[in-house]
Each structure stands twice: as C-alpha cells, then as structure tokens.
A protein has these predicted regions:
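A short helix-turn-beta junction within AAA+ P-loop NTPase domains corresponding to the substrate/partner-engaging
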Residues: 22-38
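Short, surface-exposed, polar/charged, turn-prone segments marking secondary-structure boundaries
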Residues: 8, 38-42
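AAA+ P-loop NTPase domains with strong preference for DNA replication initiators
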Residues: 42-167
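Short acidic/polar capping segments at secondary-structure boundaries
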Residues: 15-18, 35
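Secondary-structure boundary/capping positions in well-ordered alpha/beta enzyme cores
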Residues: 7-8, 31, 51
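Conserved catalytic/switch belt of AAA+ P-loop NTPases
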Residues: 1-12, 19-22
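Amphipathic alpha-helical recognition patches that constitute DNA-binding helices
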Residues: 19, 32, 111
Length: 167
C-alpha cells in the first residue's frame, strides 16, 4: 500500500461505522455509493430471504434508510419485543421515549431523530396544517442545537412527545 508496484489496485470496502487509519485514508480515493429506495428494499429482501414488508410497517421505513439500518431496526425490535408490522409510528416513538431507549440502545442513539422527523413529515404531508410545519422546523432547529451544544436529549424528546405525539 505504501509503494505499490505498477498496475496494482487495492479495493477497500468499509463499513462507515469503523474508521480506517488516517494514513490509509490519505492514500485512497473515496467513492460514496448510495442505493435508491427500490434497491435498498430489494437488497434487504435478498439478505433476509423474505419480503421486508411482512415484518415492518412501511411508515417506519424511510427513503433514506440503508439495508443495514432496516436490518438493525429488525434486530432492535426483536431485542425489545416490538411488533414492527402492527405498531404505528407514533406508538413506536412513544414506546422509545417512555423506555428511554434513545439513551440505552446504540441503534436508537444514532437513528431516533430520523424516526421523529419522519413522523413530523408525515403529519405535515397528511394534514397540510401550518402547525405541524412549524413544529417540524422547530424540532430540526432544536435537534441541531442539542447536538451542537451537547445539550440534554431527554428534554428535547419530552418536548417532542408533549407537543407532537400528545398535542
């Protein structure tokens, strides 16, 4: 890798969760490959050898999910005894907030905000009410500030629960 011979090509495939050494990264050209939604579903179905929608309510899957995120969601549901096929997205969010799983589970630590955004976006598109658009905008801003200033996530999620899920 340091001084490869002529016509030598290395392909390094990497899971984004694990970082390569900076010395290796500096010698690489990065290609970020992104699957479209249909390919994500197709790839997930191939990995599972089954149809993903037999196990998950479509409201819980986003067009931005990866096959790994969908499979991790299935694993998360098995660990926490959640029936993803029958649970609605608002029931799912309430369950996560009540059990504080956004603090306890690595998958939820990194993906919970996307479920919150998806639910708010669903409210905005379904109802066409300005109230939800303002809440969506407010949540995005508060979420960014929470991350930027390392603020308490619990107050953010309780505020979300009170204003959106119970409001």
């Amino acid at each position: 890798l340091e001084e490869p011979s002529t016509n030598t090509i290395f392909l390094i495939l990497q899971n984004s969760r694990k970082k390569n050494l900076k010395t290796i990264q500096s010698r690489c050209i990065k290609f970020h490959l992104k699957l479209d939604f249909n390919n994500v579903i197709s790839t997930t179905n191939k990995i599972l050898n089954d149809e993903i929608y037999k196990y998950i309510n479509p409201d819980l899957i986003s067009h931005y999910n990866t096959p790994g995120q969908i499979i991790n969601l299935l694993d998360f549901s098995k660990t926490n005894n959640i029936d993803l096929k029958t649970i609605s997205i608002d029931e799912f969010l309430n369950f996560i907030i009540e059990k504080k799983l956004y603090l306890k589970n690595n998958f939820m630590k990194t993906n919970f905000n996307s479920f919150l955004e998806k639910y708010l976006l669903k409210l905005v598109t379904d109802t066409k009410k300005n109230k939800y658009f303002k809440l969506y905008d407010q949540f995005i801003n508060m979420s960014n500030q929470t991350t930027l200033f390392n603020l308490d996530q619990e107050s953010l999620y309780l505020n979300y629960k009170n204003n959106v899920l119970n409001g």
